[in-house]
Amino acid sequence: NIARTEVVGWADGGAKPEAVTAAVAKFPGAKCFTDYTRMLEETRPDIVAVCPRHVDQHSAMVHAAAKVGARGIYMEKPFVRDLVEADEIVALGRERGLRVALAHRNLYHPAVSVVREWLQAGRFGRLLEARARGKEDRRGGPLDLWVLGSHLLVMTPVFLGRPVACTGLLYQNGKPVVRGDVSEGDEGLGLMGGNAVHARFEMESGVPLYFDSVQGLGEKASGFGIQLVCSEAVVDFRADAEPMIQVRWGKPFRPVSEPSGWQPFTSGGAGVEEPLEDIRRLVAGHVLPAEDLLSAIEQQREPLCGAEAGRTTVEMILSVFESHRRAGERVTLPLQTRVNPLGQI
């Protein structure tokens, strides 16, 4: 459904025969495979979508796509499982002019840049702090930080500047994670441990960012999002919702006699109906991210959410692990270690 593109190949190594049949019907004229390397070699595509949610498969697929001359890659998130793989893909992109974009679709919502403009103009007052929480379901803790937290962390440099340092701790049932709590995590993400995480990031702007996730905290996904706490308002982001952003006006720490409600914030501003038609499809349907990737290829620029942004997000996550390994010590970014620090706990 993206203009200027045509699907030429589809591959799924775990596909059942009926899935292949369905793919043939969905993508008429495209070749369908159960081996992605064969698909790449036979179709030589310009753009490749790397779709597995299992992150340990991502790096090999990117390298295979680059080998056959792909010019752009649209990747499932999280990006990769450690900074070794992230560094390799960033270097590969620079060497070959390969544009890698990540499917953190909320970052592409046009209202995000409008919030940044309002912050810079002081229309919410002074930005004091930012707070993010994961879904805090059964995945609460480091898995939540990886899988859902990456959606949030990737957005924060837009408002706060790049991360420069981190302090963080992992807990298992209220006690700090030790070596015996560490094991291979789900979804090919590598080593992790614990069912709670509490982290504080120092950002380039001087405004702190907090991330917290506790397993089974309560109502499903009730806290999943980011809040920018300003002196005159709280700006709330709910991932994958529409409206995605709402504002509660007033001083955030002052008790009031009357309840204050939330005002939707769109690409038109506060209290303005979203001027873009079908905004849900454009964002949730990955239309805006795909169009940005096409423009990035044509203009020879970094995508809005590219490999560099992906690497920063991975580095933020692993900096929490590195701080925990050092008993909550402050660690600076970029990290010295490029592997998962929990392997050295």
Where are these regions (language model features)?
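N-terminal Rossmann-like dinucleotide-binding module
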Residues: 1-27, 51
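Core-facing hydrophobic residues within beta-strands of well-ordered domains
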Residues: 5-7, 70, 127, 163
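Short acidic-hydrophobic, aromatic-tinged amphipathic segments that line or gate anion-handling sites
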Residues: 31-35
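Beta-strand-loop-alpha-helix segment that lines the small-molecule cofactor/substrate pocket
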Residues: 42, 47, 59-108, 122
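Short glycine-/small-residue-rich Rossmann-like dinucleotide-binding loops
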Residues: 44, 52-54, 213
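NAD(P)-dependent dehydrogenases' Rossmann-like dinucleotide-binding region
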Residues: 103-109, 113-114, 118-140, 152, ...
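Contiguous beta-strand/loop segments that form the cofactor/metal-binding neighborhood of enzyme cores
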Residues: 150-252, 287-303, 318-320, 335-345
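C-terminal helical cap and adjacent loop that interface with cofactors, partners, or active-site loops
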Residues: 256-345
